[in-house]
């Protein structure tokens, strides 16, 4: 499954905002320009299209100026948490339960945007499976396959992923 299965291609690529030039993620800039990212990827992530990302980041930087140029909000969980692109190209996550947003409250996922898309595609598949078989993770082999797949996307990702599908 590739990202185009979750996000349709735009008929005409868009120009992206100049603020993104400071962020080391050509794949995110390309996806923002060529894919319609304005949709829920899976239950815990909705990515923003270019217009929504600009609005979200203007607000973020107005409220938290220390984040300007260091973090770019790419999406949200719908629960008050959100996904960020850090200046070095890593994807990070902010948990609203931690209180006021500060750089110390932002968790580095240590994955690239391409890995985040791979994670999104896989989790969308898992959520479709769970829609038809809510006991899917009752099978130990399925739980292990889930953990193994996340760890193939990025070493140690299963342990870093904030939402639990089973415990």
Where are these predicted regions, by residue range?
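Secondary-structure transition/turn motif
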Residues: 87-89, 94-100, 143-144, 148-152
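A surface-exposed partner-binding patch
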Residues: 1-87, 133-137, 147-167
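A short, terminal or domain-edge coil/loop segment
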Residues: 73, 90-97, 127-135
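Short, low-complexity segments with poor structural confidence in diverse proteins
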Residues: 139-141
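Compact, glycine/acidic-enriched structural inserts
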Residues: 94-128
